[in-house]
Regions:
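Short proline/glycine- and acidic-rich turn/helix-capping motifs at secondary-structure junctions
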Residues: 672-685, 721-732
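AMP-binding (ANL) adenylation modules
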Residues: 35-38, 254, 628-630, 681-683
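Nucleotide-binding motor/catalytic cores of P-loop/tubulin-like NTPases across gene-expression machines
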Residues: 667, 685-688
Length: 732
């Protein structure tokens, strides 16, 4: 008797065996419907076997097979299996997340028949004789049916169609879907609208000449300053791939998927371009997946999950703003789309082109190791006015809720000239640090020489490297001042202060809270463009993708929260944010000014960024990372647990730590185990959050440790919700 082995979308690191009925045939990669507990689940077949270790009386039969063929190409199956193994995620969850929601729910993977309304002979007669003159809506509907009206498309309302059907004026006609590849749909049109194509400058032409003759897999890093014309390179590279008859996948950050981006691609090409964005419903997402798989679409533009789209013949992958943190999935299985795209391209033997004005340190290290090939665009396509940049030393400065008097005066000067001002708060990776406003002294752990993190809830200082903690000091350990402050400021708090200081100017605060409702962001942006708001407050949402010609002053308000963050990547993100922010000022004809507020103007990395630019900053930061044995010169994995009861989450991670200490003794003496300790934001939505960080200089050894954990610990029953994040980007 054959048995079928199923991967189910459950957080368990194993497969499930079922009886295969004699009348049923299945193939690996097809979906099946199976009983699971009291529910029915859609799973994916991973094997058909003749033997099983499960007692026969405990086995249940497969209820139904949903596909005749595998939903995954051999390359895609290999790729997703590799991803599940690398991120130590259950294969059932990975395969399920790689499919559109409708397929996870059991809908057909093949395009369905379309049902149309068509006039009957009586209906044709009614039209010819004008029998519906008094029923205007029915007449319009019957005329639409004559031209071919799809039943699901219902602009007239179901009552109109019911009335026409009752009169026997219409009938339903089934039509098989007509599948034409994107090449067939071109007919006599050229692939490219050549009138839209720009002439490349000397640097762009040199870069493109290298891309043009790419054969097979190459990981290209296009390192181009803002405004250097990376998008034009993308477009001409896509043209080359389309000329080969192949498809292209373009991955963009969440906040980079704007109508302007899409319209530029659509203006250039006469091919079918599908876009995967958050406003699509589940049916529309399924249709995009089906069109790509059958070769009907030529280009797919989407955010990170678009990577899992099935293609008929994928020829290249492009990743714009490859350094952007939104390419890392932050719920479910925590993959990084950038890293997976490189792996997938290598498996398919196709090029991957990654563009960035501020490449992450991991990518620059890959260039140094010869894993990536670097292409540079250092010249702006359109030269703009040079920026003035100044650092405000906050020590001894009079402050108003995070705003220095110098900044307030500069804001006043720009506003009085009728210009706009943009204030940025750096919140990502933020962990509050206690420092002295008078001299800049910080409370540091004497065991680790690292700043303590301030935990407001428990009113203590805690070291997130060795777990040491101490009470809040009453005065500065250096100068004796009682002016001890914490780094960090909220956008709402800043908005309240600005309303008091600048009561006569419009203020637009743009963050996740104020733009949560659909259409809010567009409304704020329209107010800014129309000059209704003169002061703009934002987080990274405003850092890129928007053109504000009247903004002449940009300020980074809380630089210190990044310079001494618990997250070792915070300085890198600050530098990337600074380069993006600097690009917001002086985009029109007027000169722009950029201000940074800090208690530590002499910080070496800050100085290298301001005086020598991002590239030198990144090289210096890499040297520092290597000395500290931090990624990319080591590998990390982060366990996160949360529970309504703090001690439950702590106890679970303590149990994990105890097991891992034994593994360390047995096979990984260089393994560092940090924690368990409360997360920097230790309570969220009523849940207490704890974490346990692992680090090892060898990626392979760390994965051996995680494989042992997966085998021995991962499937043990617990009421505490926990996740494993391999190569974590966010330690907060």
């Amino acid at each position: 008797m054959p048995f079928v082995r199923i991967a189910l979308p459950v957080p368990l690191y194993r497969y499930f065996d079922y009886i295969l009925p004699a009348s049923m045939k299945v193939v690996v990669g097809a979906r099946v419907l199976v009983p699971f507990g009291a529910q029915k689940r859609v799973g994916v077949v991973v094997d058909v076997v003749e033997q099983t270790d499960v007692p026969k009386e405990q086995l249940k039969p497969v209820l139904g097979c949903l596909d005749d063929t595998s939903l995954f190409s051999p390359e895609s199956w290999q790729f997703l299996s590799w991803a599940a193994n690398y991120y130590h995620a259950p294969l059932g969850e990975v395969l399920s997340q790689a499919l559109p929601v409708k397929l996870r729910q059991g809908e057909s993977a093949v395009e369905k028949q379309k049902i149309f309304w068509k006039p009957t002979a009586l209906g044709e007669q009614a039209l010819a004789q004008g029998l519906l003159k008094r029923s205007k809506k029915q007449l319009e509907a019957l005329q639409a049916a004559k031209n071919g009206m799809e039943k699901g498309n219902n602009p007239f309302g179901s009552g109109i169609w019911s009335a026409l059907k009752a009169k026997e004026y219409i009938t339903e006609i089934a039509q098989e879907p007509e599948i034409q590849t994107w090449q067939q749909q071109l007919v006599d049109k050229p692939i490219v609208n050549k009138a839209d194509r720009l002439i490349l400058n000397t640097q762009q032409a040199l870069v493109f000449s290298q891309l043009k003759f790419t054969q097979g897999f190459v990981a290209w890093l296009l390192d181009g300053v803002t405004g250097s014309g990376k998008t034009e390179i993308y477009l001409q590279f896509i043209e080359e791939i389309l000329n080969q008859g192949k498809q292209v996948l373009v991955l963009v950050p969440e906040i980079g998927l704007t109508p302007q981006t899409v319209s530029r691609f659509q203006a250039r090409f006469n091919v079918v371009i599908d876009v995967l964005h958050s406003n699509l419903n589940d049916t529309q997402r399924l249709h995009v997946w089906q069109r790509a798989r059958s070769g009907q679409s030529a280009v797919i533009i989407g955010t990170r999950s678009a990577l899992f789209t099935q293609f008929a013949d994928l020829g290249a992958i492009i990743i714009d703003e490859k350094h952007d943190a939104s390419f890392k999935q932050q719920d479910g299985w925590r993959y990084h789309a950038r890293d997976l795209a490189v792996v997938y391209a290598k498996q398919l033997n196709i090029p991957v082109l990654m563009g960035s004005a501020t490449p992450c340190l991991e990518s620059l290290n890959n260039v140094q190791q010869g894993k990536y090939q670097r292409l540079c665009l250092s010249e702006k396509a359109n030269q703009s006015t040079a920026l003035q940049q100044h650092v405000i030393d906050l020590k001894h400065q009079s402050m108003r809720n995070g705003l220095s008097e110098i900044l307030i005066k500069r804001m006043q000067a720009h506003l009085e000239k009728g210009n706009q001002v943009l204030l940025f708060l750096n919140r990502r990776g933020f962990a509050p640090v206690l420092l002295c406003h008078e001299c800049g002294w910080m409370a540091e752990c004497r065991h680790c020489d690292k700043p303590y993190t301030y935990h407001q809830q428990h009113n203590v200082l805690r070291c997130h490297h060795c777990s040491a903690q101490k009470p809040i000091p009453r005065q500065c350990g250096n100068c004796g001042s009682t002016q001890l402050i914490t780094t960090g400021l909220g956008t709402e708090q800043l908005e309240d202060t600005l309303k008091t200081v600048f009561p006569n100017y419009g203020i637009a605060r743009i963050d996740r809270d104020t733009t949560a409702r659909k259409g809010k962001l567009e409304g704020y942006l329209a107010d800014i463009q129309q000059g209704k708001s003169q002061i703009l407050i934002g987080t990274q949402m405003l850092a890129k993708g928007h053109h504000f010609p009247n903004v002449t002053l940009v300020a980074l308000v809380n630089v210190d929260s990044a310079l001494f963050s618990l997250d070792f990547r915070a300085e890198e993100r600050l530098a990337q944010l600074y380069m993006q922010v600097a690009g917001r000022a002086g985009r029109g004809a007027q000169q722009g000014e950029v201000l940074l507020q800090t208690h530590y103007p002499e910080n070496p990395l800050l100085q290298s960024l301001l005086q020598q630019g991002y590239n030198q900053f990144a090289l210096n930061a890499l040297v520092l990372r290597k000395a500290m044995r931090l990624p990319p010169f080591s590998s990390q994995a982060l366990f996160k647990a949360q529970s309504r009861h703090s001690e439950d989450a702590e106890h679970l991670l303590a149990k994990f730590s105890e097991y891992l200490q034994q593994v360390k003794r047995d096979m990984a003496p260089e393994l560092q185990i940090l924690g368990p300790m409360p997360a920097p934001f230790s309570k969220k939505a009523g849940q207490y959050r704890w974490q346990l960080l692992l680090q090892h200089p060898s990626r392979a050894t760390l994965h051996q440790v995680l494989t042992a954990f997966e085998r021995d610990q991962a499937d043990q029953a617990t009421k505490v919700r926990w996740i494993l994040d391999v190569d974590p980007l966010d330690l907060s």
